Amino acid sequence: MNSVFRFQVDEFRMIPSPSLSRRGIASGFALAIWIALSGCDAPKSHFATNKTWVRKTEQSFGVEVGKGKLQQVSNALTALFGTPDQPIFYQDSEAGTADFVVLDRLVRAAGPVTGYQRDDQEDASLEQLARGEGLYRQHCVHCHGITGNGKGPTAQFLNPYPRDFTMGKFKFKSTPKGLPPTADNLELTLRRGIEGTAMPSFALLKQGEIDALVDYVKYLSMRGLVERRLIEDAAELEEGEKLDTSRDNLVLEKLGTEVAKWEAVAPSPVAEPHVPIFTMNANWTEAEEKELMASIRRGRDLYYGGVANCFSCHGTTQLGDGQATDYDDWTKELYDWPNVPANEKEEKTYEYLSLGGLQPRNILPRNLRLGQYRGGRRPIDIYWRVLNGIEGAPMPAATLKPEGAGPEVKGLTTDDIWDIVNFVFSLPYDRLSRPGLEEVTNQRILP
């Protein structure tokens, strides 16, 4: 019987199919061999246009940003940042961009995966310096995408979605809302991963590899921020007018302004706690234990109070069920979904997806009883989450009282924040958080 073998993946066996003749089989194999031999070189990678921001700009300016204008934007971005295989970065002392990234690190992180690994302890030759290792594509691209827009091939299957670097917003950092992270913040995220998500720890990478990835993330973020501004410039062009690609505009104004925001950041000050900080298996004195319990009670009162107002999102039982209808800033880039009329939501969702967006999902507050802290489990990490809020998320920054202000002034003190930290740390060990354990320990007397 004339047949061709078809591979059935789920059973890992060959199934005869009567649909093709022997001549068809030979032709098929010949075509496959020709494709394999002629397609040895992988297609060149390219940065994707931010179509969502293009549409947002068109809505804001009331004009169409056509292909010609977008080509000018693409040309300007290539001049400033190069390509995924050959990145560049203008290091201009007048623009303040000279020390933003190290070019050698960009080259090391960029390009296809080569299998070449540089020894951090050795002086690299010129040939080695010009050879990338493809670190970003090896470790990051399948989730975050070539462009760093959080739309890699696995992104749609992950919850939460991978971070989009191109907006310049990063959740877990030591800096206030509205400011970029420090390089140390990015390194820490790489080293420890993000608990409860698909973001793994890269603690086994060498220091030079970590440094290269940190700089490459900064590079992708900077490119995305400049792209947004250039798209806005393109929207204002008259018919036949050219985009301003002068050094003054591209390097000094666009690139320099965005870099300055990153260069000026510093971690928020941390007030030393005046109370013991909750931890299990600590050898507390009786006085310290009483002080800690008092701190936890104060933190609980603040949690339910009108100033901190934690319960409105995290819920009255801290299960993260206070609200379930909001979205993060990345999802709301085109539309403010909570305010989209029900009869328009399907049409607008289709439009958003057609532009490359991922299916909108609600952002849920953290279940504090799990003891799973995405931004880190050190006391300082929780302190920063309460003090600074979480960038790109509905979690607000604390309203701090001016130093020396009296009780009539509304706001939190740094001591209040430490009390909230103690309350949060105590929750996973509360009896409500461990019903199974409590059931075994305190068995009911059955009739």
Q: Where in this protein do the model-derived segments appear?
A:
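Bacterial signal peptide processing site
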Residues: 41-44
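N-terminal secretory signal peptides that target proteins for export/translocation
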Residues: 1-22
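Electrostatic cytochrome c docking/interface patches
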Residues: 58-135, 249-306, 319-320, 409-412, ...
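Extracytoplasmic electron-transfer domains, predominantly the class I c-type cytochrome c fold
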Residues: 53-80, 156-205, 210-217, 242-265, ...
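Sec-dependent N-terminal signal peptides
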Residues: 22-31
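C-terminal motif of bacterial Sec signal peptides marking the signal peptidase cleavage site
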Residues: 37-39
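Short pre-active-site segment immediately N-terminal to redox-active cysteine/selenocysteine motifs
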Residues: 136-142, 147, 198, 209, ...
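Sequence/structural segment immediately N-terminal to covalent heme-attachment motifs in c-type
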Residues: 125-145, 291-316, 323-338, 420
